[in-house]
């Protein structure tokens, strides 16, 4: 099975339009267009009844002490963890494309509605739900796609992986609200094929200047 995108070249830097955050011109960050990228797939195995799409960042700091603190950087040797940006299940194998902006156009404070989604699919909670918990203006239930917004002072470039799974059943056995970890557990023994597509992103001005 193959997965690709017209939004950027596999492994390249993700354009800011597909991110939740972008540089603000003053060394920090602000909200961005937050469009879901175009994604398309082919060579779905015979017998596939549904698709699951997961987007995660595996470079998220496990401690927030230095996150977004002026005059400091999040150290590169800090242990990192997964952060789910999109959890989409029960997607029909056809049509074999997700259009740019079809599932997300802009950042929604307190989160987009869910779990019901287009094409009869369901969207899980992404990890901004936990990140913004307790925030007076942003606390909420974040369903669907919300793109990259890494710390603007992280010394690591973050990596984002879109993984598409073809399943043997039409509906994943999860009820109500669900998370990326719960979907990963539910996939066990039900996957016919999988494919990945990735990109990188940083808001650290030092790293951006070095890449020019």
Regions found by a protein language model. Give the residues of each.
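N-terminus-centered regions that define maturation/targeting leaders and the start
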Residues: 1-212
């Amino acid at each position: 099975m193959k997965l690709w995108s017209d939004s950027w070249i596999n492994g390249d830097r993700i354009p800011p339009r597909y991110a939740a955050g972008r540089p603000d011109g003053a060394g920090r960050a602000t909200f961005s267009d937050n469009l879901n990228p175009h994604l398309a797939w082919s060579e779905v195995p015979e017998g596939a009844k549904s698709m699951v799409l997961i987007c995660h960042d595996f470079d998220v700091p496990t401690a927030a002490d230095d996150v977004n603190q002026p005059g400091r950087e999040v150290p590169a040797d800090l242990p990192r963890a997964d952060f789910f940006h999109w959890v989409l299940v029960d997607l029909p194998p056809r049509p074999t494309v997700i259009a740019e902006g079809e599932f997300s156009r802009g950042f929604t404070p307190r989160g987009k509605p869910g779990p019901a989604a287009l094409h009869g699919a369901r969207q899980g909670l992404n990890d901004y739900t936990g990140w913004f918990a307790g925030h007076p203006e942003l606390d909420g239930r974040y369903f669907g796609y919300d793109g990259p917004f890494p710390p603007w002072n992280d010394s690591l470039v973050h990596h984002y992986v879109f993984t598409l799974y073809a399943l043997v059943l039409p509906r994943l056995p999860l009820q109500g609200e669900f998370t990326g970890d719960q979907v990963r557990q539910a996939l066990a023994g039900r996957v016919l094929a999988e494919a990945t597509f990735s990109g990188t992103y940083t808001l650290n001005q030092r790293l951006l200047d070095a890449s020019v």
